[in-house]
């Protein structure tokens, strides 16, 4: 059994509101972190892609378990690489693969520098195809590749049929995990569950809902030995 948390859309800006909400969620997670197999963070880590924002993030997410991160549309690839990865500045996609407890996490960079919508570059899709094996795996990125019937649909991940073709070749893919929508959600993509993580900095509501403030949220995922994924959503007040 693999148990891990997912956070998304922290939008840290060195301001009091974003910091306080992120700290609420991390303070909730910290006592659990010794029992968690990982913490996954699916993009929009920083609000402006500044070095000081990533430094705040690194301090905040200093946890006793692996922390896996992938960029979103508010992140800056060059600064992200320098501060979080200790690499030379580059605008190439930031893709990474992590094996935890016999499960593979393929983290894909769906961001497009200077834009809010998403797209997986051809090189990213080729990389993804090469790292997905026969064992259980998660495909993770920021932008959802499907319509969610909210205003983020206009800035979703486009070219989804290309990704669908890759996933179709790999039956070991358990689920697709993403963020960007600032709300908890679940649907399907390529015949697999697609799980959307709630936002930390804010919650975006459907047109039929009242536009009021919501508490920050996170997802807790449990993958059992039969490769069944169960997701629990938590709000932190």
Regions found by a protein language model. Give the residues of each.
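Short catalytic/ligand-binding loop motif for oxyanion handling, primarily in non-cytosolic enzymes
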Residues: 49, 77-79, 146-149, 185-187
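Active-site-proximal segments of metal-dependent phosphoesterases and phosphodiesterases across multiple
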Residues: 135-174, 181, 205
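Beta-strand-turn-beta hairpins that frame and shape the catalytic cleft
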Residues: 1-5, 97-107, 132-138, 188-194, ...
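Active-site neighborhood of phospho(di)ester-bond hydrolases with catalytic His/Asp-centered motifs
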Residues: 7-8, 37-44, 67-73, 109, ...
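Surface-exposed cleft-lining segments at the edges of enzyme active sites
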Residues: 13-14, 46, 110-122, 146-154
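Binuclear metal-dependent phosphoesterase catalytic core
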Residues: 7, 17-23, 166, 185-237
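Extended active-site neighborhood of metal-dependent phosphoesterases/phosphodiesterases
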Residues: 50-127, 162-172, 190, 202, ...
